[in-house]
Regions:
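Residue-level detector of the transmembrane beta-barrel scaffold of outer-membrane proteins
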Residues: 36-38, 77-79, 122-126, 159-161, ...
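Outer-membrane beta-barrel translocator domains and adjoining extracellular loop/strand segments
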Residues: 49-55, 59, 90-95, 116-117, ...
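Residues that define the transmembrane beta-barrel architecture of outer-membrane proteins
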Residues: 33, 58-64, 96-100, 119-121, ...
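Gram-negative (and chloroplast) outer-membrane scaffold detector with strong preference
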Residues: 74-143
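Short loop/turn motifs that connect adjacent beta-strands in outer-membrane beta-barrel proteins
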Residues: 24-34, 75, 109-122, 154-157, ...
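Residues on the lipid-exposed face of transmembrane beta-strands in outer-membrane beta-barrel proteins
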Residues: 39-43, 66-70, 102-108, 127-131, ...
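Predominantly the C-terminal beta-signal and adjacent terminal strand-loop region
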Residues: 90-92, 97, 155-220
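Short glycine/proline- and aromatic-enriched beta-strand/turn motifs that initiate or cap beta-hairpins
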Residues: 1-67
């Protein structure tokens, strides 16, 4: 009977193992991890129905926004956003408004976290629903929000942010136009900062194969 004795290189088996990461796999976020707060300011233009006679630049008014949200994965997040100040209606009169909406964000660059620990750029289209309050006439219509947000990470806790967003609601939001028919729009361009709270970042999943092999050798 011929017996084969497996050969192990002892020095090789006892060497510290360098981690090998699974391609495209990150660990899920904890409940307290990857929260964020965003503060931004810029300008907005109201494009209502009826439109009125002014061009786009004549409709611009200052605006600001404040958002709180969380990233659940490197690609998927959600936020609650508040914005407001004033807009020019179809007669070019100033009206006060407040807008709150919940958005789903999709970071199209999130896949990079599966290949490296730190990613500086985020590009996230978003869409959501909310409510507009016209403080001048009391209207509170349902809204659809949408846009795209870009971020550049300055440090672990702070990112610079630029956002182009839009809102669509019913034509009579400003007191003019037909009720129960979509046709009033708000377009905004804002810039500001995002502050990252809690545990920040994502852990890449480690391939355990080499650790299992070493453990089996030690047991044998």
């Amino acid at each position: 009977t011929v017996q084969h004795t497996p050969y192990y290189n002892v020095s090789e088996e006892l060497q510290p193992i360098q981690p090998v990461y699974l391609d495209g796999v990150v660990l899920p976020a904890s409940l307290t991890g990857n929260w964020f707060v965003s503060i931004a300011g810029g300008t907005s233009a109201f494009l209502g129905t009826p439109l009125g006679c002014e061009d786009l630049f004549g409709r611009l008014k200052p605006s600001y926004s404040f958002a709180v949200g969380k990233w659940f994965t490197p690609s998927v997040g959600a936020r609650i956003n508040y914005s407001g100040v004033q807009f020019k209606d179809g007669t070019l009169s100033n009206q006060d408004y407040h807008h709150i909406h919940a958005d789903l964000l999709w970071n199209v660059l999130g896949c990079r976290y599966a290949r490296q620990e730190q990613v500086r750029w985020n590009l996230a289209p978003f869409a959501g629903v909310g409510l507009l309050h016209n403080a001048s006439n009391g209207n509170n219509p349902f809204t659809v929000s949408y846009g795209v947000q870009g971020e550049y990470r300055i440090s672990k806790r702070v990112s610079a942010m630029l956002e182009l967003s839009g809102t669509t609601t019913f034509q009579d939001f400003d007191g003019y136009g037909r009720p129960n028919r979509l046709g009033d729009h708000m377009v905004s361009l804002t810039a500001g900062f995002t502050f990252h709270l809690g545990k920040v970042g994502w852990k890449r999943a480690v391939d355990a194969t080499s650790y299992i092999r070493q453990n089996e050798w030690l047991v044998d």
